[in-house]
């Protein structure tokens, strides 16, 4: 089979590598960072993560649709992957109804595209089941919560078990990957899963890439479900949100914010205060067994891209075939298998049509 170099060992790179390995290809993963590293340059460990699609349809929704049943099955059959099946409750505030009628995110719709994709989908309007007076209705369904540190290690272990090799180094130019396949031979295809670094990677330098700063708090407190809200109480903080992701180990991720073009890597104490205050105001039961037990404040840079993610085949002069798979913004985990499968299809196209 073909010799492939995958640049990047985040969720996109590892998922794509895994799908290529399952087809019998010889894969070398090249990355400055690998699971276990905690660097602001390595986005994937800082994510929540869950399956909570916010696209209204089209290709981006298709990526999420492909990933849902795979993640659900992993939660059921492979507990070592760190994925938990758990209910997701999206709270739609009464005050947001007018604007939602104009621009309604999929997670707040009464009749979203994914209602027949997920398990146990339900619109809850019965006031006896809605705790908060300012909530118009709930969108509830069976979702997954991914412990990202555990899952990234699981992905890497799966890749290694199928024969992948790993080269831990920074790639400064896309052409350098031609010298890095473990066989010593030039790879047939390079797969670029460099995430936000695609902005700086020589030979790519995608200036459409930009950071979307996120800040969350990891705590040893939990709810029996996951939660999100259509907006926060303060009108002046429109780039902030309230969401709680409940992991299998009893910890929770409480967030957060979506701050485009913010490269800051340091936690903002005032934002941490707002995040926790909102969570406790909405869910005082978080502290039923004791006060909030904070593990750490986390900051990450989601790989945003103008026009959406890039999944495509390119033939670069002097380099060869490159398949790009990056720029999923905040949807990296929930879109991972859909985007990886499309990337694999482009690899196969390059292999079968070398004169493109």
UniProtKB/Swiss-Prot annotation:
One of its GO terms (biological process) is nitrogen utilization. Belongs to the DAMOX/DASOX family. The keyword Metal-binding does not apply. Catalyzes the oxidative deamination of D-amino acids with broad substrate specificity. Enables the organism to utilize D-amino acids as a source of nutrients. Residues 1-17 form the signal peptide. This is D-amino-acid oxidase. It catalyses: a D-alpha-amino acid + O2 + H2O = a 2-oxocarboxylate + H2O2 + NH4(+); D-alanine + O2 + H2O = pyruvate + H2O2 + NH4(+); D-serine + O2 + H2O = 3-hydroxypyruvate + H2O2 + NH4(+); D-phenylalanine + O2 + H2O = 3-phenylpyruvate + H2O2 + NH4(+). Anthranilate 2 binds at residue 54. Changing residue 309 to S: Loss of activity. Changing residue 291 to S: Loss of activity.
